[in-house]
Amino acid sequence: MKKLMNVLPLLLVAVLLFGTACQGKKKEVENVNVTLFDRRTPEIKALVNGDWELVSGKNAREFCEYENTFIKFADDQYVWTEDGKAEPGALNWRKADTGAGYEAYLMDVFYETNPAYPVSVKGDTLILQDCSETGYKYTLVRK
C-alpha cells in the first residue's frame, strides 16, 4: 500500500502533463470539404473570406501557373496583389446563370465581363470557375 501511495503522485503528474500537452492540438484547422456553387452568399463568404494564393488556372486545352499572385476576400470586397502591387475591387455578388446549365452566385474577381463563381473548398484549396468561353477553373490555396 505504501508503494502505491508513492507511485500515485507520479501517475497524477504524468496524467496532468499528458493532458495539457494534448490541449494544444485541439486548435487544428477544421478540414472543410464542401461545394459552394449551391450555397447562399453568407455561407460562401464565410468559407471564402481570407487570404489566398492563386496557384493555377486550367481548361480542357491549357494550363497556366501563377507566381506571386494573391487574393484577399473580405465579404463584398477583394484585394488582388500581383508582384507586390495591390488592386482592390468590389465582388458584386449576384445570382445568375453560369453557362453550365445552373445558377450560382457570381463575383467579379477576375473580369467584370466574365465573372467567376466559387465551386468548392477542399481543405485549404479553393476552386473558382469563370464564365468565359475558355471556361478556366482556378485553384487557390489558403495562406
Walk through the language-model features, giving the residues of each:
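Bacterial N-terminal signal peptides that target proteins for export
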Residues: 1-9
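C-terminal motif of bacterial Sec signal peptides marking the signal peptidase cleavage site
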Residues: 18-21
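Bacterial signal peptide processing site
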Residues: 23-26
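N-terminal helix-cap/turn-to-beta initiation motif at the start of protein domains
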Residues: 33-53
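Contiguous, well-ordered beta-strand patches that form the walls/edges
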Residues: 58-65, 75-125, 129-137
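Short, solvent-exposed mixed-charge patches
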Residues: 141-143
